UniProtKB/Swiss-Prot annotation:
GO terms for cellular component: cortical microtubule, transverse to long axis. Residues 1-54, 73-101 are annotated as: Disordered. InterPro entries: SPR1/2/3/4/5. This is Protein SPIRAL1-like 3. It comes from Oryza sativa subsp. japonica.
Amino acid sequence: MGRGVSSGGGQSSLGYLFGGGEAPKSAEKPAPVQKPAPSSSAEKLKEIPAGIQSSKANNYMRAEGQNCGNFLTDRPSTKVQAAPGGGSSLDYLFSGNKDGK
């Protein structure tokens, strides 16, 4: 058995290297690539999710973290502001006196 001769497993695709085969076809020229048009500011606004103002779109760069302040809802914080037994927001109901007078 010589070079370029198939051994029964099918015809070799490398026949053009060893002779006796056709040269490979040249690749077709790819279609010219068109550059996308620059996007307008209206299209950029569509990329921002609903409910997020463009000035607050990046929540990861905040120094205090993303779970503080007006992260999603722009509502006041429900964080506990005083230690247990400390200043109460219900002092107006109980007249603010701790001795019960």
